């Protein structure tokens, strides 16, 4: 079964802001003036250095432009190229790294309005995540309220490594707003760099940074479970984006084991954590951190205990695979269909309105 014939839903596409000038028309005048006066040139995400090989596949790069900055190229290469009927835009412009809560909120508003006008209005296959200023949970919840009426926004986007563990109750206004509107919360690889990306200090190399993101996802997933987010918001879905997933079986076993022995301190977690995670957490497919030949990947998926966990993604334009190999070839046809179509539709209720 070819990936090109199934009409999948790509759950992780990265549109790039070509330059800060593109957002000026969407910024409040106060902040447009501040950009000019302060000489702000761009808000490129440090988590994805512009010229690092990972940031863009060689055949998806364009001389003199940011990979992902052209809507036409993104739709041609990522949607047409893989036969996808729809794609979710996760914009990683570094709004969450700003120290000013008000400035972050202004840029989040501008970025979401830019996505709506320059991307969603111009291709009916595109959907997007709401970028929010995580620096201020009340302002983030306000941005969710502002944008939730536009049904083309199907998710709320947070960075994996922010100022604090994501389960903390100070962040619950974000989850409450998302749950009220039926929006999953997507947690994407990346850091605001308020803290080291490893538990023992700052690394020397980008390789260390990116590899350690998987550990960051495990930390945040533990926080969400143990702090009671899933217990408080039982309808909430969380999607770990670009997290990898092959670490999940061992992680579930460890979390379950120590919950059994220590659950007296977290009585609100009143059922086994693996059960909670299998019901309320999903993972995008790329990167696949396992051999795609042989049965290793199938054994990992079997150990994870559910065929509903994975959502198709290319991670465009990030370089996670070559050619058309976005979907591991040895997966059973029934599982391919679930990853490509059924699981995304079950995770994102708003997609069912147009693509079911």
Give each language-model segment a name:
Residues 1-356:
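Helix-coil boundary/capping segments in enzymes
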